[in-house]
């Protein structure tokens, strides 16, 4: 796909998709546009982004998209579904209605989210059915610990193989305030959004390669290449005027009935994970192996492009930004092209024994 020497070809390729609610439209638009570019270059090939990566990891909406890609869906298919269904997941409501509802219940019903996920990954598909390695973070509310849903790419992995993907997808996207915790019957546990612990899963993706993929890949840091796609939300912070109001620092005003608290938590740990990744790569002289694609939304637009704004204007803006960034980067950035030299080898392990 590119006149690049074999030396430049990545040995292990990781796709990492950040969380961000409705802003995931930006993420999937980037991936879908790259597919279109590759399809134009290779009209006789069935181009699917997921086929080019040895590990796909994602959080929240990024986790849903990661699972969709791992099932063999194209990014273009997922883009179409999300654009059509996002308005059902995040229906427009007056802010006063949201405010009142958040006092005693989640703002949004999880049913449209489940229906959308079923369209993307199927209702019965399990981790054992996948031929692409995946890792999806979530928070196990029943134990108070993070949990990572995975394909059985480590021979000792047995817990998640028979687990349905829809449970992992609903678990990683159950953002507090917005959606109710997801109960996974097979694990007998309640889950909340993975963005509370790893909104950018790139660093844990790198560690996964060295720890639980080592039976397939005996590699060093310089052999692992990470493509990380953001959701235009990395620079969020509370306004100085809001923070300076000493009498209005409670849950309702300062934290916006939980919305600002969730966003602050996700943004802070996103920075933390990215910085840990960069320090780790720098230590091993492998900084050039990491490519981060994202944008910072201008101030006026930022107030409109939020986690739960799925209006036509917001989705169209996010889609346009994603497509533009994909075209510019693919034309100018050889590092991006190197991820798509050739498909990765499919993964399949069937000799897993039952072990908790």
Swiss-Prot record:
A motif (GXGXXG) lies at residues 19-24. It catalyses: a 1,2-diacyl-sn-glycero-3-phosphocholine + H2O = a 2-acyl-sn-glycero-3-phosphocholine + a fatty acid + H(+); 1,2-di-(9Z-octadecenoyl)-sn-glycero-3-phosphoethanolamine + 2 H2O = sn-glycero-3-phosphoethanolamine + 2 (9Z)-octadecenoate + 2 H(+). Keywords: Antiviral defense, Hydrolase, Lipid degradation, Lipid metabolism. A motif (DGA/G) lies at residues 193-195. Phospholipase activity is specifically activated upon 3',3'-cGAMP binding, which is produced by the cognate cyclic nucleotide synthase encoded in the same operon. Its EC number is 3.1.1.32. Induction: Part of a CBASS operon consisting of capV-dncV-cap2-cap3. PROSITE patterns: PNPLA. The active site is at residues 60, 193. The keyword Metal-binding does not apply. The keyword Protein biosynthesis does not apply. A motif (GXSXG) lies at residues 58-62. One of its GO terms (molecular function) is phospholipase A1 activity. One of its GO terms (biological process) is lipid catabolic process. CDD domains: Pat17_PNPLA8_PNPLA9_like. Residues 15-206 form the PNPLA domain. Belongs to the patatin family. Effector phospholipase of a CBASS antiviral system. CBASS (cyclic oligonucleotide-based antiphage signaling system) provides immunity against bacteriophages. The CD-NTase protein (DncV) synthesizes cyclic nucleotides in response to infection; these serve as specific second messenger signals. The signals activate a diverse range of effectors, leading to bacterial cell death and thus abortive phage infection. A type II-A(GA) CBASS system. NCBIfam families: CBASS_lipase. This is cGAMP-activated phospholipase. It comes from Escherichia coli (strain TW11681). The lineage of its organism: Bacteria, Pseudomonadati, Pseudomonadota, Gammaproteobacteria, Enterobacterales.
């Amino acid at each position: 796909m590119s006149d690049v020497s074999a030396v430049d070809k990545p040995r292990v390729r990781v796709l990492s998709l950040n969380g961000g609610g409705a802003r995931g439209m930006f993420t999937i638009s980037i991936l879908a546009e790259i597919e279109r570019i590759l399809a134009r270059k290779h009209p006789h090939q069935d181009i699917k982004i997921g086929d080019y990566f040895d590990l796909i990891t994602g959080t929240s909406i990024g986790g849903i998209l990661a699972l969709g890609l791992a099932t063999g869906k194209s990014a273009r298919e997922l883009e179409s579904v999300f654009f059509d269904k996002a308005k059902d997941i995040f229906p427009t409501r007056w802010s006063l209605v949201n405010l009142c509802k958040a006092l005693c219940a989640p703002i949004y019903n999880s049913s449209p989210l489940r229906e959308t996920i079923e369209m993307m990954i199927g209702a019965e598909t399990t981790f054992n059915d996948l031929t692409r390695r995946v890792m999806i973070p979530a928070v196990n509310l029943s134990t108070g610990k993070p949990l990572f849903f995975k394909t059985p790419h480590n021979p000792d992995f047995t817990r998640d193989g028979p687990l349905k993907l829809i449970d992992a997808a609903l678990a990683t996207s159950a953002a507090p305030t917005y959606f109710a915790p997801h109960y996974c019957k097979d694990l007998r546990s309640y889950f909340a959004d993975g963005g509370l612990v790893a909104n950018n899963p790139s660093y844990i993706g790198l560690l996964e390669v060295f720890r639980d993929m080592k039976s397939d890949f005996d590699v060093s840091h310089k052999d692992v290449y990470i493509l990380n796609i953001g959701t235009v939300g990395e620079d969020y912070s509370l306004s100085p005027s809001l923070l300076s109001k000493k009498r209005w620092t409670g849950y309702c005003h300062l934290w916006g009935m939980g919305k600002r608290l969730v966003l602050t938590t996700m943004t802070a740990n996103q920075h933390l994970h990215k910085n840990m990744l960069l320090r780790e790569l720098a230590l091993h002289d492998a900084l050039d192996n990491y490519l981060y694609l994202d944008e910072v939304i201008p101030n006026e637009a930022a107030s409109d492009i939020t986690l739960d704004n799925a209006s036509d204007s917001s989705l169209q803006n996010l889609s346009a930004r994603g497509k533009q960034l994909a075209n510019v980067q693919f034309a100018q950035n050889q590092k991006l092209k190197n991820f798509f030299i050739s498909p990765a080898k499919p993964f399949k392990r069937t000799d897993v024994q039952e072990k908790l």
